């Protein structure tokens, strides 16, 4: 396999910021998930991709530990399909961690500056079957293999070649994969809103997230009771009138339900209220341009097709038959392939989420097959999306036995009201994964790390100090 190639660019302000580019094998993640033979026999075995990481460290000379001696910590972004945050104005958690660590903002493969995927370059690799084989190479196993390649280069001159991780949401899922496949590389791990539901089935995951979204809708309507009638009226209007988004496609009632993304965070619900109140601002017979423009921004996957394409695959942990020849001793996981459009199947059993229900309920992080009919940016990917949903031979995402005996210190924040990563499932995972310690909150939502990062970092720091002092 092709080795890692490394390039970098450095700039100095109040922070030292170094941009790194790595050339890594496209298929090396399969070694973790399916075995070395699978990586070598893939039709893509001789190809490489570019992985980008930005390193940030405070140059404040009053800090206790000099910049060159600080330990490394890599940030694992939520998603899937989103790049790491940019550093135009450094503050919040990045600034805080940069005082004590060299912070690595890794763009996961297929996102940001790391060989980003689009409908154009996915369809260019071949027919739908080839596309499915290609996109399989952008899951957690490959992201962790990339992180290992980055670590080996950046920490090459360190006596202790371990680094720490901090993962938000999907970044927590990645953390559990990292602890499965390369625990020897990790000093300690921090997880926020990302204790993945590894011990249950994908259908059970969605049953719980629909339950949480129903509760969140009820809470929202208790704050803005007039919006229950307004949202239902908008949905009825969309069934009887043709309304078009700025990109030219018709807005449907079930696509309008995607505005539930506003309810995923602690402070965005007021944004949903302001959004809804503009719907008939121009008159009662049509939806306003400002409403349709805002709606268009909410429902398009133009910038992040990987999120839609790969979202359910983050729950496909291993093959349907439980057989992985390249992984000795592999046992069938609690959530094997296929996912088979799980969210859509669960939604069909929940009439209260029907778009023509007496009172409209908004959906959350749920991917439906009709996305690929109604979103122009996803239409070219419809066939490969179906193949991924039906795929039975996924590699493993986790080594459950390794996680159960884990010794790497893990500190996590889990939130009772989280509508995307269910609290009950998170606590089940925490009980399974060894040496895991959880701080819980009844007031933070899924975006807690974004809206209250320093508070949460403080709790994690204190827990980690207690663990290291034991």
Kindly give the residue locations of the regions a language model identified.
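Positively charged, low-complexity/disordered segments
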Residues: 1-19
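Aromatic-residue hotspot detector
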Residues: 5-10, 338-341, 463
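Gly/Pro-rich cap/lid or specificity-loop segments adjacent to the active site
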Residues: 23-247, 370-388, 392-403, 408, ...
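Conserved strand-to-loop "acid loop" that flanks and positions the catalytic carboxylate
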Residues: 412-417
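C-terminal structured domains
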Residues: 433-434
């Amino acid at each position: 396999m092709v080795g890692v190639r490394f390039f970098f660019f450095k700039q100095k302000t109040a922070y030292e910021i170094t941009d790194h580019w790595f050339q890594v094998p496209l298929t090396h993640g399969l070694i973790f998930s399916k075995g070395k033979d699978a990586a070598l026999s893939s039709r893509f075995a001789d190809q490489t991709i570019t992985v980008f990481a930005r390193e940030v460290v405070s140059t404040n000379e009053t800090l206790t530990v000099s910049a060159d001696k600080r330990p490394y910590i890599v940030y694992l972004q939520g998603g899937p399909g989103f790049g790491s945050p940019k550093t135009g104005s450094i503050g919040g958690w990045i600034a805080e961690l940069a005082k004590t660590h060299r912070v690595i903002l890794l763009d996961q493969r297929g996102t940001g500056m790391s060989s980003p995927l689009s409908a154009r370059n996915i369809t260019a690799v071949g027919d739908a079957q080839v596309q499915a084989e290609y996109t399989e190479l952008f899951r957690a196993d490959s992201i962790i293999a990339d992180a290992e390649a980055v670590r080996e280069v950046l920490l090459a001159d360190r006596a202790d070649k371990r680094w720490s991780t901090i993962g938000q949401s999907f970044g927590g899922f990645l953390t559990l994969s990292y602890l499965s496949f390369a625990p020897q590389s990790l000093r300690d791990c921090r997880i926020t809103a990302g204790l993945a539901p590894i011990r249950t089935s994908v259908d059970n995951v969605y049953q719980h997230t629909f339950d949480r979204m129903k509760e969140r809708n009820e809470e929202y309507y208790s704050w803005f009771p007039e919006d229950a009638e307004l949202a239902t009226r908008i949905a009825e209007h969309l069934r009887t009138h043709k309304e078009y988004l700025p990109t030219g496609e018709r807005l449907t009632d079930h696509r309008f339900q995607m505005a539930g993304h506003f309810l995923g965070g602690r402070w965005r619900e007021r944004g949903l209220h302001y959004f809804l109140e503009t719907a008939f601002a121009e008159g009662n017979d049509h939806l306003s341009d400002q409403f349709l423009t805002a709606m268009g921004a909410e429902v398009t996957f133009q910038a992040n097709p990987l999120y839609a394409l790969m979202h359910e695959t983050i729950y496909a942990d291993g093959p349907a038959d439980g057989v992985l020849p390249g992984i000795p001793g592999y046992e069938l996981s609690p959530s094997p392939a296929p996912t088979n459009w799980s969210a859509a199947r669960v939604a069909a059993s929940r009439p209260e989420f029907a778009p023509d229900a007496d009172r409209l309920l908004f959906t959350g992080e749920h991917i439906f097959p009709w996305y690929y009919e109604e979103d122009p940016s996803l239409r070219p990917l419809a066939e490969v999306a179906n193949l991924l949903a039906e795929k039975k031979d996924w590699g493993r995402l986790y080594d459950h036995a390794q996680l159960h005996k884990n010794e790497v210190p893990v500190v996590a924040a889990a939130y009772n009201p989280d509508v995307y990563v269910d609290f009950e499932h998170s606590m089940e995972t925490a009980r399974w994964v060894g040496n895991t310690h959880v701080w819980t909150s009844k007031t933070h939502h899924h975006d807690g790390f974004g809206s209250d990062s320093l508070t949460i970092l403080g709790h994690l720091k204190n827990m980690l100090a207690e663990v290291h002092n034991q």
